[in-house]
Amino acid sequence: MEKKTIVARAEVLPGKEQEFISKAEPLIQGTRAEEGNISYNLYQNPSNPTAFIFYEEYKDQNAISVHAESAHFQAFGKAIEGLLASELVIESF
């Protein structure tokens, strides 16, 4: 099994930063409880407060698939509708 890393970049509409963070909290807690998750953190750029990244580490590709199908992941996608300035940019390593 090979560890997988994902970086998901989000650009939030100005004034929506705190709402985005609060909507992300259930996602963060739920993901950290997943069996295949190694780490899951949200970072806000201090010099550009509308820019965020999720830095995610999983034990393998299957763990990413389980995460993508999870209820908390699906709920987050719906919860942030109208908060983003552009689509999420997701990179896998």
Region annotations inferred by a language model:
Residues 4-11, 41-68:
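Short, well-ordered beta-strand segments in beta-rich or mixed alpha/beta enzyme
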Residues 4-26, 30:
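N-terminal first-folded block
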Residues 2-5, 42-50, 78-93:
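Glycine-rich beta-strand-turn "strand-cap" elements at beta-sheet edges
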Residues 26-38, 57-91:
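An amphipathic, aromatic/His-enriched active-site/gating alpha helix that lines ligand/cofactor pockets
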Residues 2-4, 18-19, 35-37, 52:
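Short, flexible segments with low predicted structural confidence
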Residues 17, 21, 51, 70-73, ...:
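Short, structured helix-loop boundary elements
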